[in-house]
Amino acid sequence: MEENKNLEAQVAEQPAATPVQPKAKKAGKSKLTFGKVFGAALLAVVVGGLVKLVLWMGIFSTVGAFSNTGTTPIPEEGVLKINLSLPVTDAPLKDPLAGFDFTTMSTTSSMTLYNVLQAIDAAKSDDRIKGIYIMGEGLGMTPTILEEVRAAVEDFKQSGKFVIAHHDTFSQWQYYFSSVADKVFIHPEGSFSWTGVGATTMFYTGLLDKLGVKVDILRPTVCKYKSAVEPFFLKEMSPANRAQMQSMVDAMWGEITSTVSKARNISVEDLNAMADNLSVVLPEEAIEHKLVDSMLYSDQVLKLLTTEYVSEDFSYVDMSQYIASLKPDTKGSVTSQVAIVYANGQIVDGEGNDDMIYGETLAETIREVATDDYVKAVVVRVNSPGGSALASDIIWREMKLLQEKKPVVISMGEYAASGGYYISAPADAIVADKMTLTGSIGVFGIMPTTGPALEKHLGITFDGVKTNAHSDMGQGFESLDATEYKAMMRGVDRVYERFTSLVAEGRNLPVEKVLDIAEGRVWMGTQAQQIGLADTCGGIKTAIAIAVDKAALGEDYRIVERLDDVEGLAAILQSLNVKARSLVRSFSDMGRMQEELTKIEQFVGENGIYTYCPYAYTSVR
């Protein structure tokens, strides 16, 4: 892109060519024949095509070279690096250009949670890996993934190998993870953030009023906690939503402080006092309050390693390098498989394969797993805030049919709420992370009216004909009348009734109990276990162990991941679309605005009934 701009500037600076009058030529002597013009044009097309082909081959060879496994040997004395700034995802990335940065024309690593957990487990008994070094400025993992990887590092310590952490600056989540280390170090001129947890909601009502956009909200009266629609008709949190969010951040902060308290032997009361008084900002203050052990530069950390833990011949081993060095897991019988299916993203109607859950596409994957005789049990990793009620029900049906044939265990990620919980309900067991956002058993509809705003600001008007009184219902030009509103509410109430009944059936709970804990309320994983929406708290490995036990597979089984692959040009175009969005997200303020615009687009962009939870850790700090 930069080269193109420079080239355009150079061309612009050149003086305009002086027109030259052609010399008179005798008839029949012209050298500019049709054949030559056609040949030149054809040659230009061919050369241009070859240049593009070479460019794409270069890109794919770069990506391919990066993705080759087993090419870099592991040193005999290595220290495994966990770089918290590198992305770790729930599900394998679907696009063929994953890890390729078009701004720098280079590749960056992206790892899956399951592979990282497998690598840390392998490192326990790998004599070449002497310890773990935690570092990185930034955060490439969600809090739920942080918790699972942190637990794996805690287990790694049982091997007797060392774990140390060093950061220039500590964010709250970085410290939550790094507190697992035997020794924690900070840069002498770094900083420390310890402030507690807060959550913020953006409200659009004032903007909509100024624009003249009216929004009809369809929400059952009992769904008072279903707050996804509140930004469209309120200017601040409702009392119910405020209570819900306060409960969430309290539970989240409680998990952070209890974990740090245990790791650093500091009372929860003292940790809260530090946050209330902003006592820890400077490195010296972090040492004084026993959050870190010492201030060290990177070279001093290296010297410490070679003095106390390893020899000077050691080498760092990147996590992606170590994952690539591990042989594919081929142990266990190929005829006794535990399949991992990923349900990652917002739930939408139809078919597709990007960063959303398409109802028909996931349903087809579930059907394939159900009819595969080699698959004896299924773990579904759900990381979804919900979405389309219809798509959720399509997936639910296939999950129910699957559960009737073989054990199904849900592993909840960052969130498995609303529609995400809807599709989880039929499972034999539900495993939630302690900080999973789940529940949100409720429903709503939203119908924006933009006609008056378009006329006021742009002079656009609408007119038409119809055969019946309500033939133009839902087109967005006029608000719903009383009859139309009642008709829409019948559909909303029907979805809520079905949602609560299938949860009662799937979780073996009285309907009255489900109605009491539903109302659209969001629960943390620990709370979900207490009220019966989850069976236990744990990660994906816990879910796998439960699935193995329910299928009575013993030790002779194999883990397989069932993925939806996209091939050819469609995959490339989807990838480029994802890349463009990621560039926006790379700037925090722009990223937050983009997230808010995406929410508006989801609901205002098309009329419908939704089972959706508005919260994610991107809005919780």
Each model region followed by its residue ranges:
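Hydrophobic alpha-helical transmembrane signal-anchor segments
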Residues: 34-69, 77
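Charged, glycine-interspersed solvent-exposed loop segments at helix/strand-loop junctions
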Residues: 201, 205-304, 451-531, 535-550, ...
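Membrane-proximal juxtamembrane linkers immediately C-terminal to transmembrane helices
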Residues: 69-79, 332-333
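N-terminal Lys/Arg-rich, disordered targeting/topogenic segments
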Residues: 1-41
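Active-site proximal loops enriched in glycine and acidic residues that flank catalytic Cys/His/Asp
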Residues: 342-345, 382-384, 412-414, 427, ...
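Cleft-lining beta-strand/loop regions that shape enzyme active-site pockets
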Residues: 80-201, 330-453
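Intrinsic disorder and flexible/low-complexity segments
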Residues: 333-338, 342-374, 491, 563-621
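C-terminal long alpha-helix characteristic of the crotonase
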Residues: 262-263, 293-337, 444, 500-506, ...
